[in-house]
A protein has these predicted regions:
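Catalytic micro-motifs at enzyme active sites that drive phosphoryl/nucleotidyl and oxygen chemistry
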Residues: 137-141, 169-172
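Short, acidic, Ser/Thr-enriched surface-loop or helix-capping motifs
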Residues: 87, 124, 155
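Short, flexible, solvent-exposed loop/turn segments with mixed acidic/basic and small polar residues
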Residues: 15-23, 79-85, 186-194
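Non-transmembrane, aqueous-exposed alpha-helical and coiled segments at domain scale
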Residues: 8, 108, 137-140, 159-161
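N-terminal regions that are enriched for targeting/export leaders
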Residues: 4, 10-19
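C-terminal substrate-binding/cap subdomain adjacent to the FAD-binding core in PCMH-type
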Residues: 130, 149-267
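Glycine-rich N-terminal segment of FAD-binding domains in flavoprotein oxidoreductases
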Residues: 22-119, 131-137, 227
Length: 267
């Protein structure tokens, strides 16, 4: 472990961290920059003191990749602002630490959303890009990479690199777990939705044949789905499941749905 006696910049301090499920505990020098210049300063400090540094978003990954015991972490969660929003082009440019749920809250009332919506809505944009995550609507929209229009990458030497989908490094950065550099910002393509509300249907399946048949229908009739499988079922009950399927509600239905939601005590 590197010495903790060497004074780092004011936005860097040694902290204990745990993995998402609490199974791993580490101690790292955590930098929480609010500007690109502070990101550069953190990288420079690590170069000067022979330390490795790992980018960290919201810490919501199950793979526990954003832990760097005894070394440095660049926590991008404070860089979470909307840089630009082009409603006509349906594109939004955000900083790396912007959470997906904050994007939804910013655009849903404008009848827009992210085409590929990961299951973990509290993940950061950069984390979703680095892991190229997918969600319950992957069969329609693929993984998160498909909606990335362009991004800005901070290299280890402090230089920045603008990368769009035609750039030779694009496919290496997306899904690259941050190994090529630090994502500073990204422009994402949004898609129109009929309303900000969804209808969720709960569909039981008594066995694997029923599961496959139901999912074939759900793929045509719904926008997203998740299956909860009873792993202990055996014999004729193998594959026993519950399917949660969702579809966007058409605009004409939203007012009655809104009244039902408010009557149930939700906002």
């Amino acid at each position: 472990m590197k010495s903790e006696n060497q004074t780092p910049p004011s936005f860097m301090e040694w902290q204990e961290l745990t993995s998402l499920v609490g199974s791993i505990r580490t101690r790292s020098l955590v930098a929480r920059p609010t500007t690109v210049e502070q990101c550069r300063e953190a990288l420079a400090y690590c170069r000067q003191h022979d330390m490795t540094i790992c980018a960290r978003g919201a810490g919501r990954g199950y793979g526990e990749l954003a832990l760097n015991n005894g070394q440095a972490l660049l926590d991008m969660s404070a860089m979470n602002r909307i840089i630009a929003f082009d409603e006509e082009a349906a594109q939004i440019t955000v900083e790396a630490g912007m959470r997906l749920i904050d994007i939804y809250q910013a655009v849903h009332h404008r009848l827009l959303t992210l085409p590929a919506s990961p299951t973990e809505s509290h993940s950061s944009v950069a984390g979703a890009i680095c892991a190229n995550v997918n969600g319950k609507d992957a069969w329609h929209h693929g993984s998160f990479a498909r909606q990335v229009v362009r991004l800005t990458l901070l290299l280890a030497d402090g230089e920045t690199l603008a990368i769009d989908r035609s750039h030779e490094l694009f496919k290496a950065v997306v899904g690259g777990i941050g190994l090529l550099g630090i994502i500073l910002e990204a422009t994402l393509q949004l898609k129109p939705i009929p309303s900000p509300f969804v209808e969720i249907n709960r569909l039981p399946a008594p066995d694997v044949d029923a599961l496959l048949a139901t999912m074939a229908q759900v793929e045509k009739s719904h926008d997203a789905a998740v299956v909860w499988v009873d792993a202990y079922a055996r014999g004729r009950k193998t594959g026993r499941s519950v399917i949660h399927a969702a579809r966007w509600i058409e605009r004409d239905d939203t007012e009655s749905q809104r009244r039902e939601i408010l009557a149930a005590g939700y906002e």
